[in-house]
Amino acid sequence: MDLSELERDNTGRCRLSSPVPAVCLKEPCVLGVDEAGRGPVLGPMVYAICYCPLSRLADLEALKVADSKTLTENERERLFAKMEEDGDFVGWALDVLSPNLISTSMLGRVKYNLNSLSHDTAAGLIQYALDQNVNVTQVFVDTVGMPETYQARLQQHFPGIEVTVKAKADSLFPVVSAASIFAKVARDKAVKNWQFVENLQDLDSDYGSGYPNDPKTKAWLRKHVDPVFGFPQFVRFSWSTAQAILEKEAEDVIWEDSEAEEDPERPGKITSYFSQGPQTCRPQAPHRYFQERGLEAASSL
């Protein structure tokens, strides 16, 4: 698995895929979707699909694929290599979503929460397989959120495909188990080979599991937080654990919007115009356009 594209630029997203097996262009195929790294405060989240012909599903099961969380790293690597060898009937694709992309999506002016990002990434990978002319007839997905709602959404988006969304799908359906292995192997490689663009002093590679409740992970975050610039891009700064450390260890930042909220001359809430109490008339500050240009209203010229 070549992650060189991600290593060159780990600020956005990276898509990797195998060649499409010729048989998958002709025969009806089943496709599984799963992710790795949804919960950690460190490193990317990886979504993966795996697909194969329905007629070869028994061959995939014979590899004894299982939920990646139940396998050791060596077992995952062995199964990944075996599925790569079986490239004549097994195909895969994955999206690597950087911590920076996840955090800026969640904290942007227009919020894009993790569930929506996950749903759209999964749908994008299914669409990618279809765009590659893979003859997908069945899709199995490990759920994010309510499975019924998620399934209805995917079914509406892909009306010609039989979609099944289940909790713990990675332990129920071999094709989802295979996808979970691809996702986990890719994330482990991405984390292990992460290129820090920041000039960190005494970089500690022992950060524990990467999950927010891990004491080692918390200690790593406290050690590598900059009081002005915050965390390296390896950190999902939208996670509450990271935000709490920033508030305690970093310098306070006053944003222009924050100043405006504390300005006594800012306009009142719209609901104040409909309240029954005594109305207080407050002067309104001019629009930002006029303030920046030093323009004021004039009654005479």
Curated annotation (Swiss-Prot):
It holds the Pfam family RNase_HII. Residues 255-284 are annotated as: Disordered. This is Ribonuclease H2 subunit A. It comes from Mus musculus (Mouse). It catalyses: Endonucleolytic cleavage to 5'-phosphomonoester. GO terms for biological process: mismatch repair; RNA catabolic process. SUPFAM superfamilies: Ribonuclease H-like. Manganese or magnesium. Binds 1 divalent metal ion per monomer in the absence of substrate. May bind a second metal ion after substrate binding. Belongs to the RNase HII family. Eukaryotic subfamily. Residues 255-264 have a biased composition (Acidic residues). It is found in: Nucleus. The keyword Protein biosynthesis does not apply. GO terms for molecular function: metal ion binding; RNA binding; RNA-DNA hybrid ribonuclease activity.
